[in-house]
Each structure stands twice: as structure tokens, then as C-alpha cells.
């Protein structure tokens, strides 16, 4: 853990973060909202008082940094789970923290590549995305910027929607 301007910067160690990613990605899908809530609680994530689909992780500085998305066709099912793997900064990281973000991002990519094969990668001025499409049709999207690292695990139904949209283009 590092401190920047009085704020603590936290990172899930890659072993722990990858274990959480695997638990979600390798879960039986479709996943019910109650199964997602059980995983949320198992990971020690704190739900918002008024909405259990929004939560706070241990790497947060107290703000909500995770979300469980409902499937649009059946709200008892989950479409995605999104959470931060680091504290979210409000300005670009100082060099020492930028180095931590970059090295941790690389460690996550290496660990997930060793589990799921080579990812596809997109980069922009804002940051980088690595995407793994699993045989189960679950997708893992790891994002890194100069301010944070996050991950989205999307259901097979989301991949079906993405493919349908691509066919329409």
C-alpha cells in the first residue's frame, strides 16, 4: 500500500485478484443475482445500503467501486460483474504509483494469459484493455489507465449480444 497526498493507494495482489476473477469467470452461468451476492459477500465486498448490486471493495478509499449488472431480459440473472483491482485516483499517478499500476497490470495480464491463453489487446490515449474470451463464452476485460486497474467479467449472454450486434454492422 502506498500513500499519495494523504490518500492510500491499494492494490489487490495479483494472486488474490486472479483468484477472485477465476471464481466469477469459472462460476456456472447463467449466474443468478443471489449467487452474485453470495460471491460479493464471500470476497468481503460491502454492498451499498440502498442497492446490493453496487459495492465497495477493500482497495477502495471508501467510494463504491464495483457493480453487478442485471441481464436486461431476465433481471434475476447477472450480465456482468465489474470491480476495481486498485484504488481509483482522481489525477494521473505520480511516477512511483504509475510504476506500481503498470507492473501490477502486467502481472495480471501474465497470470490471466497463463490461465486462459493469449488475450487480445487494445490501447488508446486513455489506457489499455486486454480481453479473454473463454470457451464457456464468458469474457474477461482487464482495463488499465494512469489512475486505476479494473476488470469486467461478462456473461455468455453478453457475448451473444456483442456477436449479434457485429453481424448487423
Please report, for each region that a protein language model flagged, where it lies by residue.
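Short helix/turn-capping signatures at newly exposed starts of structured segments
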Residues: 1-126, 137-138, 144-169
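Active-site beta-strand termini and strand-to-loop segments that position acidic
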Residues: 131-136
Amino acid at each position: 500500500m502506498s500513500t499519495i497526498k494523504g490518500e492510500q493507494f491499494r492494490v489487490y495482489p495479483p494472486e488474490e485478484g486472479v483468484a477472485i476473477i477465476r471464481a466469477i469467470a469459472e462460476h456456472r452461468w447463467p449466474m443468478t443475482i443471489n449467487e452474485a451476492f453470495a460471491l460479493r459477500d464471500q470476497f468481503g465486498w460491502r454492498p451499498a445500503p440502498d442497492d446490493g448490486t453496487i459495492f465497495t471493495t477493500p482497495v477502495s478509499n471508501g467510494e463504491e467501486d464495483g457493480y453487478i449488472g442485471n441481464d436486461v431480459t431476465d433481471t434475476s440473472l447477472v450480465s456482468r460483474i465489474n470491480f476495481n483491482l486498485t484504488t481509483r485516483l482522481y489525477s494521473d499517478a505520480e511516477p512511483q504509483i504509475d510504476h506500481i499500476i503498470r507492473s501490477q497490470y502486467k502481472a495480471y495480464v501474465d497470470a490471466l494469459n497463463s490461465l486462459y491463453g493469449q488475450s487480445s489487446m487494445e490501447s488508446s490515449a486513455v489506457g489499455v484493455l486486454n480481453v479473454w474470451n473463454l470457451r464457456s463464452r464468458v469474457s474477461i476485460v482487464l482495463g488499465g489507465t494512469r489512475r486505476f486497474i479494473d476488470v469486467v467479467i461478462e456473461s455468455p449472454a453478453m457475448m451473444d449480444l456483442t456477436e449479434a450486434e457485429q453481424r448487423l454492422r
